[in-house]
């Protein structure tokens, strides 16, 4: 395994040197974890992170993994996956979705409208003049965005208290298991606290 990684790194580096490229697709960035890809972030102090990227849903405080990948995927393309996962788990569609602005693409808005699912993203276009209905909608959106902020807090809590921050496994399968078990552990603790 290690020898294959070294050989692949050599091939990639040689290709970059010969063709005078600055980057290459699926570039290996870790000798021991050749499946890991860099994930560019917009966070302060951390421009690039390495590891798995997980798309989560939060239902009644429980975190559920809808999509897990070591590749840098665009979250906005995975909204249908999350809705399908919800429907499989609960045998119904969600009434509403509290989501980040990145999910507010025209395709996603159209998809949610077709499924009669309310979304907590701002409407496209100009805001209507002093309309009572639009004010109520804005208040509802703000309330749902506060719920979404709880998800961010739950992720931070899971990184600190449930070993999601430091994954100590050595291959892709065990790393996925580690992440799933950390989420499971968090959800069990939450269920026990609610009893």
What residue spans do the PLM features occupy?
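A contiguous, basic/glycine-rich beta-loop/short-helix subdomain that forms a polymer-engagement track
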Residues: 5-45
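Helix-centered, glycine/charged polyanion-binding patches within enzymatic domains
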Residues: 101-173
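Flexible loop/turn segments at secondary-structure boundaries
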Residues: 38-39, 63-65, 72-74, 103-108, ...
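Charge-patterned, long linear interaction tracts outside catalytic cores
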Residues: 170-195
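Short glycine-rich phosphate-binding loop at a beta-alpha junction
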Residues: 93-100
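Electropositive, glycine- and tryptophan-enriched low-complexity nucleic-acid-binding patches
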Residues: 43-89
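Structured core elements
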Residues: 30, 55-57, 64, 98, ...
């Amino acid at each position: 395994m290690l020898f294959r990684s070294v050989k692949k790194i050599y091939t990639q580096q040689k290709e970059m040197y010969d063709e005078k490229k600055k980057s290459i697709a699926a570039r290996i960035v870790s000798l021991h974890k050749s499946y890991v890809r860099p994930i560019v972030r917009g966070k302060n102090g951390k421009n690039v992170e390495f590891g798995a990227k997980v798309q989560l849903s939060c239902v009644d405080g429980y975190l559920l993994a809808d999509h897990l990948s070591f590749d840098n995927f665009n979250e906005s393309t995975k909204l249908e996956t999350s809705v399908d996962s919800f429907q499989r788990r609960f045998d119904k569609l969600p009434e509403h979705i509290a989501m980040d602005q990145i999910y507010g693409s025209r395709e996603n808005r159209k998809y949610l409208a077709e499924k009669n699912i309310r979304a907590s993203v701002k409407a496209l276009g100009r805001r209507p003049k002093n309309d009572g209905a639009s004010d109520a909608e804005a208040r509802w959106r703000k309330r749902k965005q506060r719920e979404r902020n709880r998800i961010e807090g739950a992720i931070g809590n899971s990184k600190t208290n449930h070993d999601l921050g430091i994954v100590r496994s050595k291959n892709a399968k065990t790393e996925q298991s580690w992440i799933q078990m950390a989420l499971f552990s968090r959800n069990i603790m939450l269920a026990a606290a609610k009893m």
